[in-house]
Amino acid sequence: MAQVSMRDMINAGVHFGHQTRYWNPQMKPFIFGARNGVHIINLEKTLPLFNEALAELTRIASNNGKVLFVGTKRAASEAVQAAALDCQQYYVNHRWLGGMLTNWKTVRQSIKRLKDLETQSQDGTFDKLTKKEALMRSREMEKLELSLGGIKDMGGLPDALFVIGADHEHIAVKEANNLGIPVFAIVDTNSTPAGVDFVIPGNDDATRAIQLYVSAAAAAVKEGRGNEAQVAEELAADAE
């Protein structure tokens, strides 16, 4: 079972919140105290919440659910992409485009355009164009890849969002809320837990903390996908 320990979280600095003057009073239940003007998150609260979230991610993945990892902060970008690819899921790590979920029809058209351009770049179409036209299409493809590359094979709306920094990704959280998609999010002391179904109180800036969150989430998803494969094997065996 994918789980994290208290030691894992302490070593990663999950307990370091933001400066006290930036706090959101809604996070008071999850704050242990303050040290040198910085709020300290109560990891006794975070630990069970994090492990409950991981168990639910495993359950969603075991039902063939799609998980979208979201983290567009510079500190989160690479880790989010790597974790999503590791568990064969999806990611947005550059910029959240408004309507990415709530206007999926339009997004789907942009994804189709991206795939068309990828095909053109590989089948020699670009070579037949003028240098200027080829460059323009190449730039368009790169721009679309940056925004949509992590969701181009998602094939529809996700079944869950795993978000690094609820405050920073508030548009993604709101869109998921509007569509009834469960939100799992790291919520720091300066953020609001409103709209987050699975609140994980923790530092949302430290690279080591972010690495812990996304690798644990990826492990939970992989475990769920493993269960899914095991069930499929058992059903196939029963059918024989």
Swiss-Prot record:
CDD domains per UniProt: RPS2 (cd01425)
Entries under InterPro entries matching the protein: Ribosomal_uS2, Ribosomal_uS2_bac/mit/plastid, Ribosomal_uS2_CS, Ribosomal_uS2_flav_dom_sf
Disulfide bonds: none
UniProt KW Heme keyword: no
GO MF annotations in UniProt: structural constituent of ribosome
One cellular-component annotation, GO: cytosolic small ribosomal subunit
Gene3D superfamilies xrefs: Glucose-6-phosphate isomerase like protein, domain 1, Helix hairpin bin
BP-aspect Gene Ontology terms: translation
Keyword vocabulary terms for this entry: Ribonucleoprotein, Ribosomal protein
Pfam families documented for this protein: Ribosomal_S2
This protein's record includes keyword Ribosomal protein: yes
NCBIfam families from the UniProt entry: rpsB_bact
Protein family: Belongs to the universal ribosomal protein uS2 family.
Protein name (record): Small ribosomal subunit protein uS2
Organism: Haemophilus influenzae (strain ATCC 51907 / DSM 11121 / KW20 / Rd)
Gene name of this polypeptide: rpsB
